Amino acid sequence: XGESWETPETGDEVE
């Protein structure tokens, strides 16, 4: 898959 979500720590977009 390839879901992009923001990390609760920095808010960076991670795939």
UniProtKB/Swiss-Prot annotation:
A molecular function (GO) term: calmodulin binding
Enzyme class: isomerase
Superkingdom of this protein's organism: Eukaryota
EC annotation from Swiss-Prot or TrEMBL: 5.2.1.8
Reaction(s) this enzyme catalyzes, per UniProt: [protein]-peptidylproline (omega=180) = [protein]-peptidylproline (omega=0)
Isomerase found in the keyword field: yes
Keywords: Calmodulin-binding, Isomerase, Repeat, Rotamase
UniProt entry tagged with the keyword Cell membrane: no
Miscellaneous note of the record: On the 2D-gel the determined pI of this protein is: 5.3, its MW is: 72 kDa.
Function text: PPIases accelerate the folding of proteins during protein synthesis.
The protein's assembly and partners: This PPIase probably binds calmodulin.
Name the record gives this protein: 70 kDa peptidyl-prolyl isomerase
Natural source organism: Pinus pinaster
Organism classification: Eukaryota, Viridiplantae, Streptophyta, Embryophyta, Tracheophyta
